[in-house]
A protein has these predicted regions:
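Loop/helix patches that line or flank the sugar-binding groove of alpha-linked glycan CAZymes
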Residues: 423, 429-656, 662-666
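Acidic/aromatic-lined carbohydrate-recognition and catalytic surfaces
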Residues: 23-306, 315, 332-406, 412, ...
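Boundary at the C-terminal end of the N-terminal hydrophobic targeting segment
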Residues: 17-21
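An active-site-proximal structural segment forming one wall of the substrate-binding cleft
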Residues: 304-324
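Solvent-exposed beta-hairpin/edge-strand motifs
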Residues: 673-689
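C-terminal beta-strand-rich structural cap/linker in extracellular carbohydrate-active enzymes
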Residues: 695-721
């Protein structure tokens, strides 16, 4: 450990000598005078920093009665779902503008688009991050390195449009009874003005980040920074050496975005930076994700991170007009070396506290939040007690894809049983098809509960064994010669929903698809939409889903894949309305993806299209008020491909049965339906003209499903109208 104790040094830290920049932690002693140019640059950075923008914004709300108009201390999942229960999740960089010169935001504000959304039943648009991102070098901005998930300003990214256009989009959504859903990224920023000021030890900016100043005598532990770069990733040996010196907590047991030679650890070192006080320093900083995404420090005496993130949330709600916010990567807000010596970073209690603060502030201003991070069920349960209102369904997402790929819904049934044991309400989950990320198969609950045993396929497996089995079966079917159009990424697969389905069907060559193949893909795609829509909570789908996008050829985005981020193949550009057929790429430079289903304009003219069938499904969901239902049972079944959910509809209006055959063979099975009265009849919600089914005296329902088919059945009490 370092010999210099911070407590013993406290009197020295408060001394004039230290304040002048001459202390042992200040680097090389220099004259205290700071050049006018350096001071001017610091002020230039500060004016553009998010922390400064948060300070200015806070003045308008501190002491204002607006803070006391809404309840905020507890999550309000049902109120959040009532505000918008069907979402379109946009990805700005993939959006093809309506016409040359039209911005992405103006494209998303078009009346024709919102008319199409309303026809489908979409009630909210999650824009994805739209604020300026990337970094700052000297007086210029550098581009985003992670799809605008490296935010550096509260300003709208000029590549997407303007603040005025954003507000017009909000107005367009509201005129169609919908909301706009924005983003806050509480775990990290890009290398913008805030980080550059932190490097320069300016004011309280170093308190923003999990960054540690390294004594000049220990600079030998740090590798040199390559020419043209501003930081260098540390080797495991360097991390261990710094940990032994007492600088950092050390290596994390598993890394995100691990790529040999690119990201060997979650720690990087800056080059020598001359500070605002003229002192030269080198820093080591934490970044769970890419090197250009330094991690915020949520427990620093300056409380700078809290001020920045909450200021960003206030800006989204009060200035831009968003009705809900995503908290991205919100489970990585605390880190320490625990008493056993283990580095504790996932599911840290500080994350719970931080999420509570953000979610409370958002609810204070009449907004709602949702989290988007794959968490174990026990952590989700703790988070639901005081944090975000909704959670992204990373729990059943890999499970339902596993069911489709294998024709065996056993793992999906097990996951639902565990959710019930942990008290996870599906009504507070966002059940989604594709999003901008890979199909994640981290299956985190079983990784954390690696030694616990679970029933599966007639035996018992440890969490580790079960996780490995499920992942192996999915990888075998989604990658390699069987499906060369998908690529591995991290603990998942870069794919679109359409290419997951294609792999399920054994289609290897996407360039040789015939009309019959497209129809089969569309049919199974709708089956997955049915699974997600016919549950309580939020149903979300993307632009790639709406047009039936295929993955991009890797060669077409080769430069973007250079750092190992293969997700760019599942982010191809799409033109929702077909307004700009000549465009070969989006404004963000992504090539146009092959769209199997065509534009929404084309699809809504055909009753048999994906969008039109989807609209009928969403209408049925709305008529049942299924978004507000309660999961009552997950019946045991015999056929391995059969999956059944029993929901209690709100206001005592009966039961709804969601029945899906994930297998390639027809099913005819009698299933027990708890809570159904003798003599009740089951009506097919999507085909009401079909003869109703009778429940037997033993409360069992005979389900007949073709291969890859589903039914939604409503059961009313015999005396109900």
């Amino acid at each position: 450990m370092r010999r210099w104790s911070c407590l013993a040094a406290l009197p020295y830290l408060l001394s004039p000598a230290y304040a002048a920049g001459l202390g042992p932690s200040s680097g090389e002693p220099v004259a205290p005078a700071v050049s006018e140019r350096a001071s001017s640059y610091s002020h230039w950075l500060e004016e553009r920093s998010m922390l400064q923008q948060a300070r200015v914004l806070a003045r308008h709300y501190s002491g204002n009665s607006i803070q006391w108009q809404h309840p905020y201390g507890q999550p309000q999942p049902h109120a959040a779902v009532a505000r918008a229960s069907v979402w379109f999740t946009a990805y700005p960089a993939s959006t093809i503008a309506a016409s040359p010169g039209t911005s992405v935001i103006s494209t998303l504000a078009e009346e024709r688009l919102w008319s199409a959304f309303q026809a489908i039943g979409i009630q909210g648009i999650h824009t994805g991050p739209m604020k300026r991102s990337g970094g700052v070098r000297d007086l210029g901005y550098t581009p985003s390195i992670d799809g605008n998930f490296d935010r550096i300003s509260f300003e709208i990214d000029p590549a997407f449009g303007t603040e005025a256009q954003y507000k017009a989009m909000v107005a367009a959504a509201r005129s169609h009874g919908a909301i706009v859903i924005g983003d806050v990224i509480p775990g990290h920023t890009g290398k913008g003005p805030d980080f550059r000021l932190a490097e320069r030890a300016y004011a309280d900016y170093p308190g923003l980040y999990h960054m540690v100043q390294i004594e000049p005598r220990d600079w030998g532990l740090l590798p040199p920074v390559p020419a043209g770069h501003d930081a260098v990733n540390l080797t495991p040996a360097a991390v261990d050496a710094l940990q032994k010196k007492g600088y950092i907590v050390g290596q994390l047991h598993s890394g995100i975005f691990y790529e040999p030679g690119v990201k060997d650890t979650d720690w990087s070192a800056t080059d020598v930076v001359r500070g605002a006080d003229g002192v030269q320093r080198r820093w080591v900083y934490l970044h769970y994700f890419k090197q250009g995404q330094p991690t915020l420090n949520w427990l620093d005496p300056s409380f700078a991170a809290e001020r920045l993130v909450i200021g960003d949330a206030v800006h989204e709600l009060a200035v831009l007009g968003d009705g809900m916010l995503r908290l991205d990567a919100n489970g990585l807000l605390g880190i320490e070396r625990d008493p056993t010596g283990r580095v504790w970073w996932a599911g840290h209690p500080l994350s719970l506290t931080a999420n509570q603060l953000i979610a409370d502030m958002v609810r204070k201003l009449d907004g709602f939040t949702f989290e988007e991070l794959a968490l174990p069920l026990d952590v989700m349960r703790e988070m639901s007690r005081g944090g975000p209102d909704l959670s992204y369904d990373f729990v059943t997402r890999p499970a339902y894809d596993h069911a489709l790929l294998t024709g065996d819904a056993g793992f999906l049934r097990l996951v639902f049983q565990l959710m019930r044991e942990y008290g996870i309400d599906p009504g507070r989950l966002i059940h989604a098809l594709q999003n901008h990320d890979e199909l994640t198969m981290g299956i985190s609950h079983f990784a954390v509960h690696a030694d616990e045993t679970f029933p599966f396929r007639g035996g018992r497996l440890t969490g580790k064994e079960l996780r490995e089995l499920v992942r192996r079966e999915m990888y075998d079917r989604l990658l390699g010669e069987r499906a060369p159009y998908n690529l591995k990424f991290g603990e998942g697969v870069a794919s679109t929903t359409a290419t997951v389905v294609a792999a399920t069907l054994g289609i290897r060559d996407l360039g040789a698809l015939k009309p019959g193949d497209v129809e089969r893909i569309r049919r199974l795609h709708l089956l997955l939409a049915f699974y997600n829509a016919m549950q309580p909570g939020v149903f979300a789908l993307s632009g790639w889903d709406l047009v039936g996008a295929l993955t991009l050829p890797a060669a077409s985005v080769r430069e973007r894949l250079a750092d190992g981020d293969t997700r760019w193949i599942n982010r191809g550009a799409y033109d929702l309305l077909g307004s700009n057929p000549q465009a070969s790429q989006s404004a963000g430079g992504l090539p146009r993806a092959v769209a199997l289903y065509g534009s929404l304009t084309e699809q809504l003219q055909s009753s048999d299209s994906f969008a039109s069938r989807l609209a009928r499904l969403i209408r049925a969901r709305a008529q049942l008020h299924l978004q507000s239902a309660r999961l009552a049972d997950v019946p045991a079944v015999q056929a391995k491909g059969l999956f059944v959910l029993v929901h209690e509809l709100p206001d005592n209006t009966g039961l709804e049965i969601t029945a899906i055959n994930f297998g390639d063979r027809a099913i005819d099975e009698s299933v027990p339906i708890r809570g159904a009265a003798t003599g009740s009849k089951a009506i097919d919600v999507l085909e009401p003209q079909a003869p109703p089914l009778d429940l037997g005296p033993d409360g069992r329902l005979q389900l007949r499903l073709n291969a890859f088919a589903a039914k939604a059945l409503r059961i009313k009490d015999p005396v109900s109208p």
